[in-house]
């Protein structure tokens, strides 16, 4: 990731990938054919782009650490997601991912790291790289670990009700089936309130 030398603070939307941009499946999304964008996500992200936000993905990709897929596979899928979004007026400014898996990882990947959410090492790196304004930036994710990560870096987390969640092998998560106009407007209104503070 190229570091920005611009001294201007940027509004950023930090966003999880699997389950927030593309549909979460019970396995791992490491091939292009696994990727199905959540309906309405293109509209949501294009609205943030129009408002001058940098769109930055922060994602756990522990399947690398388990030996299920490679770094190259993650880059291929990330480029594909970016391509799909750019065809619809959106796009990703930066991808940050953690390959580690403390529980099921092998070799050098079986570590308790600070970059795997809820750790915030990657988020802090992205904040630095993009000169993010913590006060006007926000984090959107489907997993409780996303909220914990955002909290550690003093980034506002869009208030998802995690009381009615699915418990999965990858944590407590809500299922975002689509970004309806009402949900998009709610997220945009939340972001706007941050800009007024």
Residue ranges and their predicted role:
Residues 21-39, 64-73, 87-90, 106-114:
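Metal-dependent phosphoesterase signature
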Residues 41, 45-84, 90-101:
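Substrate-recognition element of Asp-dependent hydrolases with the DxDx(T/V) motif
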Residues 27, 98-101, 163:
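Short, solvent-exposed coil/turn elements at secondary-structure transition points
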Residues 2-56:
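Active-site neighborhood of HAD-like aspartate-dependent phosphohydrolases
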Residues 16-18, 60, 142, 146:
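Acidic active-site catalytic centers that drive phospho-/nucleotidyl reactions
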Residues 2-8, 72, 79-93, 103-139, ...:
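Asp-based, Mg2+/Mn2+-dependent phosphohydrolase catalytic module
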């Amino acid at each position: 990731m190229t570091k920005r030398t611009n001294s201007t603070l940027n509004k950023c939307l930090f966003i999880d990938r699997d389950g927030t941009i593309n549909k979460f499946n019970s396995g791992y999304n490491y091939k292009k054919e696994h990727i199905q964008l959540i309906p309405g996500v293109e509209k949501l992200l294009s609205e943030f782009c129009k408002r001058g936000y940098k769109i930055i993905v922060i994602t756990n990709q522990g399947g690398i650490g388990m030996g299920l897929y490679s770094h190259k596979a993650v880059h291929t899928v990330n480029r594909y997601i970016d391509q799909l979004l750019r065809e619809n007026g959106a796009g990703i400014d930066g991808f940050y991912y953690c390959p580690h898996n403390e529980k099921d990882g092998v070799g050098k990947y079986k570590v308790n790291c600070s970059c795997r959410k809820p750790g915030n090492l990657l988020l802090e790196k992205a904040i630095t790289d993009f000169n993010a304004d913590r006060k006007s930036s926000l984090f959107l994710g489907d997993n409780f670990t996303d909220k914990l990560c955002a909290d550690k870096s003093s980034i506002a987390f869009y208030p998802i009700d995690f009381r009615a969640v699915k418990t999965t092998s990858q944590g407590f998560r809500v299922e975002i089936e689509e970004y309806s106009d009402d949900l998009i407007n709610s997220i945009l209104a939340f972001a706007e309130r941050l800009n007024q503070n």
